[in-house]
Swiss-Prot record:
GO terms for molecular function: DNA polymerase processivity factor activity; nucleic acid binding; transcription elongation factor activity. Keywords: Mitochondrion, Mitochondrion nucleoid, Transcription, Transcription regulation, Transit peptide. InterPro entries: RNaseH_sf, RuvA_2-like, TEFM. Belongs to the TEFM family. This is Transcription elongation factor, mitochondrial. Transcription elongation factor which increases mitochondrial RNA polymerase processivity. Regulates transcription of the mitochondrial genome, including genes important for the oxidative phosphorylation machinery. The gene is Tefm. It holds the Pfam family HHH_3.
């Protein structure tokens, strides 16, 4: 739990000064931020007069607890305290064991809780515990777990780490996938609508060693054709360095990735903000159920399905401009060779949006 020292209560009682930190929750009433905030110069007499003293058991006066929550939040908390059984109360971590039984017994003996302050009268529950109990009722553990799992998914599969708020603020992205012969990209807005989708032939990887200047010239030429976007998403290959036979291909991928990071991150030196991110290739494969063991299968049929749905469905998973949907489909059908980079660039863009905004299929980790 996060604590903020500037939200502390200093209370003068019986010649002793006591400090009570208050937890900060976004869902709480704004009143929380003003609770007990006093200037250091406030006279002790006035401070003591304005806030009641704590008793010897460390229990805070009831009125302080009520000021932390809005009337709606108090009503929600009281509803749980007055209607839940002891087993249901145990779902909240701090009420496991004897505390949940004490709440039910207190309710039977004295009637329903009329205010949050009366919670402090329950045995084993003091002010600090009461605050944590109220917070856990407002923000159940499963909701916190879902949020932390969501952050874990983004941290694990999208690198470098970027705040989710910033990811959600993007208006468009360019998804880039490169192979041994070509670089493909898909430009999508957040609807998501395909704004641009194409590829460029760059090289045919052979045993020949290419100088760095060759990579710079080839990739710079491609970058000049790529549309501007808020973020650029690159595919992170799953090739292992342990497989020595694939080392030339892995080296080629790493050089290409480094070049794209440098050429597309044009403002990084000024603001330190990453505009180029990498997403794990197999994570996208799992998102669309394209994995067979550790091997990712072709996304060709899935892309054809997206194209068909964009014409037939009112709310397709991906939107294509009508004049381009037929053109793209014909290109895929007529292609004599597999253009996997083109398929993968689109799937990667869709997976990115669905992971960030939580729509579509859930990632199977």
């Amino acid at each position: 739990m996060a604590w903020r020292a500037n939200l502390a209560c200093l209370i003068k009682a019986g010649g002793r000064t006591r400090w009570f930190p208050l937890p900060e929750y976004l869902s709480m009433s704004p009143v929380l931020h003003n609770t007990c905030s006093r200037r250091k110069s406030t006279a002790p007499e006035k401070l003591a007069a304005s806030v009641a003293a704590c008793d010897t058991n460390g229990k805070e006066p009831g009125t302080a607890l009520g000021r932390l929550y809005s009337p709606e939040q108090q009503a929600s908390i009281l509803h749980v305290l007055n209607t839940a059984s002891d087993k249901e109360l145990e779902a909240f971590r701090l009420l496991r064991g004897r505390k949940s039984v004490n709440i039910v017994e207190h309710r039977k003996k004295f009637g329903p809780f009329q205010s949050l302050e009366s919670l402090i009268g329950v045995p084993l529950i003091q002010y600090k515990t009461a605050v944590e109990v109220c917070n856990s009722i407002l923000c159940p553990e499963n909701r916190r777990r879902k949020k932390s799992q969501e952050k874990w998914v983004l941290r694990k599969f999208i690198k470098p780490g970027v705040e989710k708020e910033r990811l959600k603020a993007v208006n468009s992205i360019v998804s880039i996938v490169f192979g041994t012969r070509r670089i493909a990209w898909a430009h999508l807005d957040r609807k998501p609508t395909v704004l641009d989708w194409q590829q460029a032939e760059c090289w045919k990887l052979t045993n020949k060693t290419y100088p760095s200047s060759f990579y710079l010239e080839e990739i710079s030429s491609v970058v000049s054709k790529i549309p501007k976007a808020d973020l650029y998403i690159l595919e992170k290959s799953g090739l292992s360095i342990q497989n020595t036979s694939l080392f030339p291909i892995l080296l080629h991928f790493l050089i290409t990735e480094a070049m794209l990071y440098a050429l597309l991150n044009k403002t990084f030196a000024k603001d330190g903000q990453h505009r180029v991110l990498s997403i794990n290739r197999n994570a996208v494969g799992k998102h669309f159920d394209l994995m067979i063991g550790d091997t990712r299968t072709s996304g060709r049929e899935l892309v054809k399905q997206f194209l068909s749905e964009s014409v037939l469905k009112e709310q397709p998973r991906v939107f294509f401009p009508r004049e381009l949907a037929v053109q793209y489909r014909q290109k895929i059908v007529k292609s004599s060779h597999r253009i996997e980079e083109l398929y993968d660039s689109l799937l990667q863009a869709v997976a990115f949006y669905e992971l960030v905004f939580g729509s579509g299929s859930e990632l199977k980790c």
